Regions:
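N-terminal carbohydrate-binding accessory modules
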Residues: 24-77
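Aromatic-rich peripheral "rim/lid" segments of glycoside hydrolase catalytic domains that contact
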Residues: 31, 56, 273, 277-280, ...
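Substrate-binding cleft and catalytic face of glycoside hydrolase catalytic domains
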Residues: 71-226, 231
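Bacterial N-terminal signal peptides
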Residues: 8-16
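Conserved, mostly hydrophobic/aromatic
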Residues: 43, 72, 123, 175, ...
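Acidic-and-aromatic substrate-binding clefts and catalytic sites of carbohydrate-active enzymes
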Residues: 51-52, 56-63, 88-92, 96-104, ...
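Glycoside hydrolase catalytic-domain groove-lining segments
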Residues: 62, 66-69, 201, 215-225, ...
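Active-site beta-loop-alpha junctions enriched in small/polar residues
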Residues: 45-48, 85-87, 125-129, 177-182, ...
Length: 400
């Protein structure tokens, strides 16, 4: 995920538009062509627990308060993605924000999702806070480790985490080994470029160590799909460069994960061309593991949104409920159309991340850890699938 919040503040406009008027915009539904029965209709709900702790409430299409996971399930969502940070707090115990996704929070959400009959994708960040192509900070406890120590630690951490999920009865169905790791992970030892040579040898060693740790906990036919995830899903040259290098080093994996934001990355047609190519080139399944679009340009809090008029112009769809619906529909269809049934599904990024006072992308402690001093708040609530008052949008029905 790219930078989450701009530097400026916008006035609060939460009351200046009518949810009912927005809802009226998304009455036009569209059928899919040959969507497989097992197609993944996923949602990343990693901030949900923290939003609820700060007072967020959610309402179904009948205006009845309900668990948002149950609301999403009723609209067809069948898979949940949850990120995991190692230790998202400072030495004084101040949480970093962004969902405070430590082991306890992630397990709690995993149990709720599994109780709804959903499958689980666990997203290991191998950091204490946000990671993406521009930052891959080592966990604080790992900072002074050399490369051999990092290999041992990532192995043991992955092994022990999966063991805990098994113990709690929520073994993931799929695991990401790192998040948007175009630039590698656990910098600088695991960085994929600019380190004087041997970058992919070291990165592959870390990936293999983590995967070995995962597999130590699988027995009696248990299967967990392994995903490697890059950002900028339209950039075929990036995916070829990265996966060619990983393939040379025999890193075992099942799925290529892609992030896809049309307002940053370009049109869905370019994503489709990339998925067609890499699924054939590497003989792997593909999943769009992050995607989102705005349903309005209005703002629900004091933090200026990352999706504004510029993003609407570049994103290819109007910032309306119908536009959001059409974006998700077209994305799902593009993935389903990947040849040889290699396109397995999508995950919508943070449908439940509505604006709630106190629930922020980063606290001052979190900003200090990632060296990114911005304003607190939510810069993405206009891309949720619930409105500012917590009512599910008609666009969520696209999954049905």
């Amino acid at each position: 995920m790219k930078r989450l919040t701009p530097a400026l503040l916008a006035v609060c406009l939460a009351c200046s538009f009518s949810p009912a008027a927005l809802a009226a915009e998304a009455q036009q539904t569209r059928a899919f062509r040959a969507l497989p029965a097992d197609f993944i209709k996923g949602a990343d709900i990693s901030t949900l627990l923290d939003a609820e702790k700060h007072g967020a409430k959610f309402y179904n299409h009948n205006n009845q308060q309900q668990d948002p996971i149950a609301i999403l399930k009723a609209d067809g969502v069948n898979y949940v993605r949850l990120r995991l940070w190692v230790d998202p707090k400072d030495a004084q115990g101040q949480g970093y924000g962004g969902g405070d996704n430590d082991l306890a929070a992630t397990l709690a959400l995993a149990k709720r999702a599994k109780a709804q009959g959903m499958k689980l994708l666990l997203d290991f960040h191998y950091s204490d806070f946000w990671t993406d192509p521009g930052k891959q900070f080592k966990p604080k406890a790992w900072e002074k480790m050399d490369y051999p120590q990092l290999k041992t630690t990532i192995h043991d951490y992955t092994r022990d985490t999966i063991a805990r999920f098994k113990q709690e009865g929520v073994l993931p169905d799929m695991v990401q080994i790192g998040n948007e790791i175009n630039g590698g992970m656990l910098w600088p030892e695991g960085k994929s470029w600019g380190q004087g040579g041997g970058e992919f040898d070291r990165l592959a060693g870390l990936l293999n160590a983590a995967i070995d740790g995962l597999k130590e906990n699988l027995q009696n036919g248990e299967q967990v799909k392994i995903m490697l995830h890059l950002a900028e899903g339209t950039k075929n040259d990036t995916f070829r460069w990265w996966f060619d290098e990983i393939s040379k080093r025999n890193v075992p994996y099942d799925i290529i994960g892609l992030s896809m934001y049309t307002y940053w990355n370009g049109p869905i047609s370019a994503l489709k061309a990339n998925m067609d190519d890499i699924s054939r080139r590497y003989n792997k399944d593909v999943i769009v593991v992050e995607a989102a679009y705005a349903y309005t340009l209005e703002n629900c809090d004091n933090a200026e949104n990352s999706f504004q008029a510029k993003e609407e112009k570049e994103g290819g769809y109007p910032a309306t409920v119908q536009g959001q619906y059409n974006y998700i529909h077209d994305l799902m269809q593009a993935v389903a159309d990947v040849p040889d049934q290699r396109g397995k599904g999508i995950f919508y990024w943070e449908p439940t991340w509505i604006a709630v006072p106190g629930n922020t992308w980063a606290t001052p402690a979190g900003m200090k850890y990632i060296h990114d001093e911005w304003k607190q708040g939510n810069a993405r609530e206009n891309q949720a699938l619930f409105d500012c008052q917590g009512k599910v949008l008609p666009s969520a029905k696209v999954f049905n």
